[in-house]
UniProtKB/Swiss-Prot annotation:
Identification of the protein by name: Protein-export membrane protein SecG
Pfam families reported in the protein's UniProt record: SecG (PF03840)
Organism: Rickettsia conorii (strain ATCC VR-613 / Malish 7)
Coiled-coil blocks: none
Localization terms from the record: Cell membrane
Regions that span the bilayer: 1-21, 54-74
Bridged cysteine pairs (disulfide): none
Annotated membrane topology: Multi-pass membrane protein
Family membership noted in the UniProt record: Belongs to the SecG family.
Length: 100
């Protein structure tokens, strides 16, 4: 479960980086790769709105996934601590000296 969520988390992070780099900035950044002029079927404003909405959605998914991963990780860690404590108790009981 954690492995799948971790893969999804990394995928969302990569997509988020790509979408942020494609957004129009003051210096036009990488957004000029898509043509840069308003002569196409889709206007620059429409593309900007799509990229803004995509950024918001990906950021929300990223944060939710991070919280779920942190929650699962803390539960897994507490389970590990309880198992270690059980092993230590069993070893302490088994290591008592035998009277002759």
């Amino acid at each position: 479960m954690i492995d799948i969520l971790l893969f999804v988390h990394i995928t969302i992070a990569i997509l988020l980086i790509i979408v942020i780099l494609m957004q129009r900035s003051g210096s036009d950044g990488i957004s000029s790769i898509s043509g840069g002029n308003n002569m196409g079927v889709v206007s620059a404003k429409t593309v900007g709105n799509f990229l803004t909405k995509s950024t918001i959605i990906l950021t929300t998914l990223f944060l939710i996934n991070a919280i779920v991963l942190a929650n699962l990780s803390s539960k897994k860690k507490s389970d590990l601590v309880s198992k270690i404590n059980e092993i230590e108790e069993n070893q302490a009981e088994n290591s008592l000296p035998i009277a002759k």
